[in-house]
């Protein structure tokens, strides 16, 4: 069975944490296809700071050394907000016989009940939840705990060989990097070069982004 991983985010900007996390995931799971999915206008997050075109360009630059990583722009190409359930339905229509795995952070898991039609997501894809140590002490919503009790299975073969319906928690490494922090540091003219791919850093400076 063809296995597909979908890593969604604003990538505003894409940073080394995104890349290192993805490399760790691929080293452990080895998905046949791995897509970075830039969101258009997340319904439960503030609007992005860079334009859609700029965010895609930064992704292209960041992924140049990694030809196995692809970019999927279907959310940017839609006129509607970035509702993940619609995106997964679109993937499922295109890849009817493949396993789909949506990669989210542990914070995303805790916020899952806030997602539009979130109950449908587990029927459309598996969930690969990246463990974030700082969230471990937060109470898990009852609805999410019910999902974990019913669907959690940390066997990677389940993700690779089942169309949907499993939740796997995986420690992909801890990287103290966030797009929010990078934007704040750039605005304060602090050095962020070590947290960004070189080509992305050069692009941000050239475009004078996040000033």
From Swiss-Prot:
Pathway: Cofactor biosynthesis; NAD(+) biosynthesis; deamido-NAD(+) from nicotinate D-ribonucleotide: step 1/1. One of its GO terms (biological process) is NAD biosynthetic process. One of its GO terms (molecular function) is nicotinate-nucleotide adenylyltransferase activity. It catalyses: nicotinate beta-D-ribonucleotide + ATP + H(+) = deamido-NAD(+) + diphosphate. Pfam families: CTP_transf_like. SUPFAM superfamilies: Nucleotidylyl transferase (SSF52374). The lineage of its organism: Bacteria, Pseudomonadati, Pseudomonadota, Gammaproteobacteria, Legionellales. Belongs to the NadD family. This is Probable nicotinate-nucleotide adenylyltransferase. Keywords: ATP-binding, NAD, Nucleotide-binding, Nucleotidyltransferase, Pyridine nucleotide biosynthesis, Transferase. It comes from Legionella pneumophila subsp. pneumophila (strain Philadelphia 1 / ATCC 33152 / DSM 7513). Its EC number is 2.7.7.18. It comes from the Bacteria. Catalyzes the reversible adenylation of nicotinate mononucleotide (NaMN) to nicotinic acid adenine dinucleotide (NaAD). It is an enzyme of class 2 (transferase).
């Amino acid at each position: 069975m063809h296995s597909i991983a979908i890593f969604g985010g604003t990538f505003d900007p894409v940073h080394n944490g995104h890349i290192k996390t993805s490399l760790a995931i691929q080293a452990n799971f080895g998905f046949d296809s791995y897509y970075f999915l830039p969101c258009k206008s997340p319904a439960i997050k503030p609007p992005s700071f860079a334009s859609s075109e700029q965010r895609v360009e930064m992704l292209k630059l960041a992924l140049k050394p990694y030809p196995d990583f692809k970019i999927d722009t279907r959310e940017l190409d839609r006129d509607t907000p970035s509702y993940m359930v619609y995106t997964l339905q679109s993937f499922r229509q295109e890849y009817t016989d493949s396993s789909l795995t949506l990669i989210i952070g542990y914070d995303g898991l805790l916020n899952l009940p806030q997602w539009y039609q979130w109950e449908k997501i587990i029927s459309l894809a598996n969930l690969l939840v990246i463990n974030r140590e700082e969230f471990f002490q937060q109470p898990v919503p009852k609805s999410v705990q019910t999902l974990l009790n019913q669907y959690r299975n940390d066997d990677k073969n389940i993700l690779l060989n089942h169309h949907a319906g499993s939740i796997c928690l995986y420690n992909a490494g801890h990287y103290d990097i966030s797009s929010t922090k990078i934007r704040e540091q750039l605005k304060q003219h602090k050095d962020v070069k070590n947290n960004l791919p070189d080509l992305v850093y050069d692009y941000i400076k050239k475009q004078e982004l996040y000033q």
